[in-house]
Amino acid sequence: MENHDTQQLQALESAVKDWFKPLAYAIILLTDEAYPCVFYPDLFGAEYIDIKEDQEVHIIMPKVEELPGLLEARKLFAYGKQIDYFDHPNCIAFVRTGDETHPGCVVIMSNSEEGYKEIELGKEHADSVYIDFLKNRHEEISTDQNGKAVFRVNPGSVSVWVRKQ
């Protein structure tokens, strides 16, 4: 992800594409072993003027629209054991199983076309309905009698599926 050294006109300038930032933040914020860190301009946006080759350059760093939702998802759902579904080069998923007081979630992301994963959550999740907490997908997903369902994600996007209350 970007930081004060990698933003525009800085020594290590290396821009991360805007579409990819929510995917990276989903990994940083929702996986069990990641160290959560958020770059201030990604949360609040930033605008500044700097000098490049004796010319003033106006820099605008838009906020990552999904970031508040991902932070909220971390607080509410990113608990318990992690089960990875890293079986495709462009579409991955992981399940956070939850704990005694947090229900867990299914996180699925694609860096290419629309993707899906068939995931069995267990009989304790049988006949349940799931919604995308980030609202990138609008359908509801129902699990079968074994707690299995197909979870989908939009092209170049991330979805955090949680049990509907």
Please report, for each region that a protein language model flagged, where it lies by residue.
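Carbohydrate-interacting/catalytic domains
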Residues: 1-165
